[in-house]
Amino acid sequence: MYFMKNVITLIGLVLFSSFCFASEPLPWQMGFQPPASPIMEELHKFHDFLLYISTAIVLFVAGLLVFVCIKFNARNNPVPAKFSHNILIEIIWTVIPIIILVIIAVPSFRILRHAEKIPEADLTIKVVGYQWYWHYIYPDHNDIEFDSVMISDENLKPDQKRLLDVDNRIVIPENATVRFLITASDVIHSFAVPSLGFKIDAVPGRVNETWTRVAKKGVYYGQCSELCGINHGFMPIAIEVVSKEDFDNWVASKNKVAANGENSKLAAN
């Protein structure tokens, strides 16, 4: 009884820890991070749907191979068959894969359309990739802008995550539709946050866009996902989702800092 109690407690702790850190990659993780946006929820369901189809195909083909090897080996069939084709079988193995592909294509195109069609945004954020950090601009809020650089091991605090946390996070309100306008200044980067279901290339001279909407407060981590130089692995992305009130307070504090900076420049001149 005591042993079972410990086992149940251990399982509970593992599940709880997985829930707490659902917005980041975990050691020995299998599968996707838990979805945190509408697009990722659809991708998650589509992935599971494809897994069922793929498993059925693998089991069917493997079973067919075993059946053929047993039933049609040289011992059971000393005289081999002489026919060269079978029209019915050829029609079947052509039509069935087409049907399977159509079944896969319909939800796939629906998800692509949902991801590509940007809804009316409550907030727009410009994202610019540099070697090797991100620069963010909030054009709807007096052009708040700041660099976001990975926190080095020397400056890392106990509650911060190595190779994931940054000095300045993107901050967005919960349940808000956020549009990202993404480009780069030097080489090609890729703006990717797995739990939010987007991975968009940042290309110099070109603006790509995507969107998200997150209902749950927390911090969601990503990485640059396009090889962009020696420090490619040190370009994390951190998106903090807060309440509308906290977001307004954050905007006010950023604008205040910017205003104080401008006043300091004027006083110096």
Curated annotation (Swiss-Prot):
Q: What class of enzyme is it?
A: translocase
* Reaction(s) the record says it catalyses: 4 Fe(II)-[cytochrome c] + O2 + 8 H(+)(in) = 4 Fe(III)-[cytochrome c] + 2 H2O + 4 H(+)(out)
- Could you list this entry's UniProt keywords, alphabetically sorted: Cell membrane, Copper, Electron transport, Heme, Iron, Membrane, Metal-binding, Respiratory chain, Translocase, Transmembrane, Transmembrane helix, Transport
User: Known Pfam families for this protein?
Assistant: COX2 (PF00116), COX2_TM (PF02790)
Q: Which cofactor does it need?
A: Cu cation; heme
- EC code(s) of this entry: 7.1.1.9
One Gene Ontology term, aspect cellular component:
plasma membrane
Keyword Transmembrane helix (UniProt): yes
How is the cofactor bound, in the record's words?
Answer: Binds a copper A center.
The listed locations are:
Cell membrane
What is the membrane topology here?
Multi-pass membrane protein
State the InterPro entries in the record. Answer: CcO_II (IPR045187), CcO_II-like_C (IPR002429), CcO_II_C (IPR034210), Copper_CuA (IPR001505), Cupredoxin (IPR008972), Cyt_c_oxidase_su2 (IPR014222), Cyt_c_oxidase_su2_TM_dom (IPR011759), Cyt_c_oxidase_su2_TM_sf (IPR036257)
Q: Which CDD domains match?
A: CcO_II_C
* Amino-acid positions noted as binding Cu cation in the UniProt annotation, renumbered to this chain: H189, C224, C228, H232
- According to the UniProt record, which cysteines are disulfide-bonded? none
Give the transmembrane region(s).
8-28, 50-70, 87-107
The UniProt entry's sequence similarity note says:
Belongs to the cytochrome c oxidase subunit 2 family.
Purpose of the protein: Subunits I and II form the functional core of the enzyme complex. Electrons originating in cytochrome c are transferred via heme a and Cu(A) to the binuclear center formed by heme a3 and Cu(B).
Q: What is this protein called?
A: Probable cytochrome c oxidase subunit 2
Name of the gene this protein is made from: ctaC
